[in-house]
Each structure stands twice: as structure tokens, then as C-alpha cells.
A protein has these predicted regions:
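Receiver (REC) domain active-site loop signature in two-component systems and cognate sites
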Residues: 58
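C-terminal output helix
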Residues: 105-119
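Helix N-cap/capping motif at the beta->alpha junctions
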Residues: 32-41, 63
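Short, Lys/Arg-enriched segments at the junction into DNA-binding effector domains
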Residues: 4-5, 117-130
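Charged docking surfaces used in two-component/phosphorelay signaling
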Residues: 17-25
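Active-site residues of response regulator receiver
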Residues: 55, 82
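Active-site beta3 strand of CheY-like receiver
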Residues: 46-53
Length: 130
């Protein structure tokens, strides 16, 4: 099986490492970006990214702007992983096209399960379209 690529975007390197460690153990290949601009550079240059995990509060370009840019080009699944727990923020995420919204602190095992579930759904949908 080819490794499924996940792009993890967070300005906190500890958070990126935590998520990367858990996803790598499950066989995913994790690419990292420290802000939205870096994330877009990576995303636009790698057409094999299957899922993006995105923080909201980051320097240079926040998660909302990053998501808007990604949605101009792709319907890749996106999970927001953020400390912004307000209902208004969560609704904004769904309005912008987020597939999941997970607030910090979070359970890494639940995150891995949600990643797998989203990828299963998108894989099933792609199979049905053929």
C-alpha cells in the first residue's frame, strides 16, 4: 500500500510532531507546514495530498484564509484542529468547507480515527463515481 499523504499545518512544532507521530504509526506519510503560506506552497506542489489538518491561529496566513485558498483549487478533505472552541468559529469552519472541526486539547487516538473515517468516506465516494 502506498502511504497516504497528510499535510499537518500548525505554527507550534510540538503540535505538528505529536500529530505526525500518531499518524506515522498508523502508516500515513505526514508533511509539515508552520503557517498557511508554507502550507499552500506544499499543497500546490504536491498533488498527492489526501487530507489537510489545519490550525486556525497562525502567523502570515491563518487557517481560514488557507482553507479559502485550498477550496479555490481542491475539495481535499480538511480537518480544523484548533483551540478556537467557540460555536461561531466552528460554524464558520463548516461554512468554508471543513470536513471535521476538532478543538484542542484533543485525543490523538480520536484524531487518527477521524482521519481514517474521512479518508474511507472520500475513497468510497471516489469509487462510486467511477
Amino acid at each position: 500500500m502506498d502511504s497516504i499523504k497528510v499535510l499537518m499545518v500548525d505554527d507550534e512544532s510540538r503540535m505538528r510532531k505529536l500529530v505526525k507521530d500518531f499518524l506515522t504509526r498508523e502508516g500515513y506519510m505526514v508533511l509539515e507546514a508552520g503557517d498557511g503560506e508554507q502550507a499552500l506552497d506544499i499543497f500546490m506542489n504536491d498533488k498527492n495530498i489526501s487530507l489537510v489538518i489545519l490550525d486556525v491561529m497562525m502567523p502570515k496566513m491563518d487557517g481560514w484564509e488557507t482553507l479559502k485558498e485550498i477550496r479555490k483549487f481542491s475539495q481535499v478533505p480538511v480537518i480544523m484542529l484548533t483551540a478556537k472552541a467557540d460555536e461561531r468559529d466552528e460554524l464558520q469552519g463548516f461554512d468554508l468547507g471543513v470536513d471535521e472541526y476538532i478543538t484542542k486539547p484533543f485525543s490523538p487516538k480520536i484524531l487518527v480515527a477521524r482521519v481514517a473515517a474521512i479518508l474511507r468516506r472520500t475513497s468510497d465516494a471516489a469509487s462510486e463515481e467511477k
